[in-house]
Amino acid sequence: HSALGHRYSLLTRLWPSNPFSRRYLQTRDDREGVRDADWVSGAALVHRREVGERLGGLDPQFFMYCEDVDFCYRARQAGWRTRYLPLVTVRHDIGGSAERVKPAMIRARHQSLWKYYRKHFRRNPVKDAVTYAGIFGRSAWLLLYDRLGGRRVK
């Protein structure tokens, strides 16, 4: 679901209040109470020592992106829960003031998305091909847009 409602997806841009986007983006109305979450940002990830030891920590194959998503997914597969705590606020400023995202970061993000997909979901050749085309087609578009002097892209 999060791929459909991701902050930068076409669906979110055309219909911001759709159920997929609302679930992924968690609008202010959705931030009431402690509850389960699919994943939390690595900047806000706190876990029991036992979880890190059993899972082996963050997977080093992921650079900059998806390491937190992967960790939370593996934790869920092992029987643990990821919880959202509204009383905690974490601010992550790295890259926030940059006018444009560097091409290396665009590539790293999309390579990590593909690695994550391959690690956990690769099963069907048709679905794999469509997913690959979607991830790297988007990457190519963002790199071209950036190269042509587009505004900040993600």
Task: Enumerate the language-model features and the residues they cover.
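Active-site-adjacent helix/loop segment of glycosyltransferases
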Residues: 70-152
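Acidic/His-rich active-site region of diverse nucleotide-sugar glycosyltransferases
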Residues: 1-55
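Short, conserved glycine- and acidic-residue-centered signature motifs
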Residues: 64-65, 106
